[in-house]
Amino acid sequence: MNRLMILVFAAVFLALASADEDVDIAKRGIPCLCVSDGPSTRGNKLSGTIWMKTGGYGGNGCPKGWHFCGKSRGLLSDCCKQ
């Protein structure tokens, strides 16, 4: 069971790390709460997408054409909006 969880986590991590090559990532990524979405997730649309921080991006972890929209920065990922 632990091996399966590690495998699934690694697959999601690799998919998100290489997602900048995907044209339609805004519809495929993991949604996150932007500051502009409101105070809670109940009934609010999650308009951000979680991006994994990689070496090719700037200090904010968001790819070119996207901007940071979350309340705080994550250790390995940021909530970004196109």
UniProtKB/Swiss-Prot annotation:
Keywords: Cleavage on pair of basic residues, Disulfide bond, Ion channel impairing toxin, Nematocyst, Neurotoxin, Secreted, Signal, Toxin, Voltage-gated sodium channel impairing toxin
Coiled coil: none
GO MF terms, alphabetically ordered: sodium channel regulator activity; toxin activity
InterPro entries the UniProt entry points to: Myo_ane_neurotoxin_sf
Signal peptide stretch: 1-19
Disulphides: C32-C79, C34-C69, C62-C80
Major subcellular site: secreted
GO cellular component, one term: extracellular region
Subcellular localization(s) per the UniProt record: Secreted; Nematocyst
UniProt family annotation: Belongs to the sea anemone sodium channel inhibitory toxin family. Type I subfamily.
Identification of the protein by name: Delta-actitoxin-Aeq2a
